[in-house]
């Protein structure tokens, strides 16, 4: 065990910070003349104490000293060059006691010193964070020690004010879980920044996953200004709001009334009202009504979104010096009557909603005569879980998902034109994919019998 390891108490029930106190005996190189400090540090790196958060240069007896490696007991333990410098600079070796307390050790080190020995190999010190709230997923064997773990995480992360754990792993239809407060304030209303936008929501009542921020940005990067996007399971707006900031026209939907409430609030916070319409519908109903909802929006705005922006305008023709003033300008964006993209971020069940796209435009066959018409790209998230005794290749997993999609939309897609993106591994046997494909004309315009 290192001299710098924390003291051990595996019987601790409530966190006792005062227990974490340790004194480490060291030797310090005392400089009667501190002008030699810089030269010594440069020449004697291998004999200087370098330990996390410990300053190796200290004040001592109206001058300065440098802490030496913790295994140095006398001058003979030092490198020959260091011994020469000690004599050359008139350095005196003096004993020094380094005092360590609770603040010195990282959360993982503290937890390894207080949890049962059979649990220290995989200490749960990591977490995902939304605003001031840290969310950990404790395995069953760690749950009896949840309060201890939560308090240490709270102490060691200044931006965290609340630490929670899932009571169980069975989500309701809104993808939310009952939470247990482990430490800190019982305040679940958080403010989170992502993709240049601000989001406010009640973490206990809506779905939010900070680990998906890269995926949000990846999908948003596929949208162009003026595109129309249907966000089927939009939550509080992690896709919709950043997209609408780049003048993407978004119809955002979520079944959860709380998500819908905060989606509306986040639209106002981010001032993207002209480009986004929120809905509180079942996903199937939203897909079914999507063309009608878009047409209603188009007609209510005479096919145009107007956005007031402030622009610098030149007011002087002088070529050597130009003067500008800020003027309000009305920027216009045409509202198409068709969708460019649909986002389906509900990996547990999004695939099962794909059959609703059959006949999406079936009642409006003349739509494809629009010279600007494009078929929508579907971005559907899904899990493709496999057994522990399996070792499928990515290609095999892609094929499994491909077959499911073709069966659901009742059409043999060209697999070569589809994109299979692995978002993350939720567990060793549970990859999450996002599959992107163009909805075939034969499917989109299929007539209902």
UniProtKB/Swiss-Prot annotation:
A family per Pfam: TYW2_N_2
Keyword Lipoprotein on entry: no
Keywords attached to this entry: Cytoplasm, Methyltransferase, Mitochondrion, Nucleus, S-adenosyl-L-methionine, Transferase, tRNA processing
Subcellular location: Mitochondrion matrix; Nucleus; Cytoplasm
GO biological process: mitochondrial tRNA methylation; tRNA N1-guanine methylation
UniProt GO molecular function: tRNA (guanine(37)-N1)-methyltransferase activity; tRNA methyltransferase activity
Binding-site positions, S-adenosyl-L-methionine: 216, 254-255, 282-283, 345
Enzyme class at the top of the EC tree: transferase
Catalytic reaction equation(s): guanosine(37) in tRNA + S-adenosyl-L-methionine = N(1)-methylguanosine(37) in tRNA + S-adenosyl-L-homocysteine + H(+)
Principal location: mitochondrion
PROSITE patterns: SAM_MT_TRM5_TYW2
SUPFAM superfamilies the UniProt entry points to: S-adenosyl-L-methionine-dependent methyltransferases
A single GO cellular-component term on record: nucleus
EC number(s) given by UniProt: 2.1.1.228
Subunit structure: Monomer.
UniProt xrefs under HAMAP family: TRM5
Assigned protein family: Belongs to the class I-like SAM-binding methyltransferase superfamily. TRM5/TYW2 family.
Name used for this protein in its record: tRNA (guanine(37)-N(1))-methyltransferase
Organism from which the protein derives: Candida albicans (strain SC5314 / ATCC MYA-2876)
Gene for this chain: TRM5
């Amino acid at each position: 065990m290192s001299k710098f390891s924390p003291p051990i108490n595996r019987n601790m029930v409530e966190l006792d910070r005062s227990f974490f106190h340790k004194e480490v005996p060291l030797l310090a190189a005392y400089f009667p003349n501190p002008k030699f400090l810089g030269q010594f540090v440069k020449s004697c790196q291998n004999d200087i104490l370098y330990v996390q958060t410990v300053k190796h240069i200290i004040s001592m007896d109206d001058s300065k000293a440098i802490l030496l490696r913790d295994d140095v007991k006398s001058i003979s333990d030092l490198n020959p060059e260091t011994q020469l410098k000690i004599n050359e600079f008139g350095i005196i070796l003096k004993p020094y006691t380094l005092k360590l307390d609770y603040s010195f050790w990282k959360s993982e080190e503290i937890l390894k010193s207080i949890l049962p020995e059979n649990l220290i190999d995989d200490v749960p010190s990591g977490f995902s964070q939304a605003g001031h709230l840290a969310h950990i997923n404790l395995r069953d064997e760690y749950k009896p020690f949840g309060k201890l773990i939560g308090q240490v995480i709270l102490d060691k992360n200044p931006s965290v004010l609340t630490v929670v754990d899932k009571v169980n792993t069975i989500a309701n239809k809104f993808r939310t879980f009952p939470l247990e407060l482990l430490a800190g304030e019982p305040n679940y209303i958080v403010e989170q920044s992502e993709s240049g936008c601000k989001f406010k929501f009640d973490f206990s009542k809506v779905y939010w996953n900070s680990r998906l921020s890269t995926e949000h940005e990846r999908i948003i990067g596929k949208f162009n200004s003026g595109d129309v996007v249907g966000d089927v399971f939009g939550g509080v707006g992690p896709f919709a709001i950043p997209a609408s900031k780049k003048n993407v026209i978004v119809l955002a939907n979520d079944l959860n009334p709380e998500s819908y409430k905060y989606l509306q609030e986040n639209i106002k916070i981010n001032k993207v009202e002209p480009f986004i319409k929120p809905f509180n519908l079942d996903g199937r109903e939203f897909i079914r009504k999507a063309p009608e909802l878009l047409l209603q929006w188009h007609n209510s705005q005479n096919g145009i979104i107007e956005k007031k922006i402030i622009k610098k305008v030149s007011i002087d023709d002088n070529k050597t010096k130009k003067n500008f003033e800020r003027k309000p300008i009305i920027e216009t964006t045409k509202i198409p009557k068709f969708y460019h993209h649909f986002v389906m971020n509900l990996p547990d069940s999004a695939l099962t909603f794909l059959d609703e796209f059959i006949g999406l435009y079936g009642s409006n066959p003349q739509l494809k005569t629009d010279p600007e018409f494009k078929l929508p790209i579907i971005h559907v998230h899904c899990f493709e879980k496999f057994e522990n005794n399996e070792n499928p290749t990515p290609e095999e997993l892609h094929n499994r998902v491909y077959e499911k999609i073709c069966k659901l939309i009742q059409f043999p897609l060209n697999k070569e034109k589809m994109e299979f993106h692995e978002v993350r591994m939720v567990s060793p046997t549970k990859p999450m994919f996002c599959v992107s494909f163009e909805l075939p004309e034969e499917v989109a315009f299929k007539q209902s019998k």
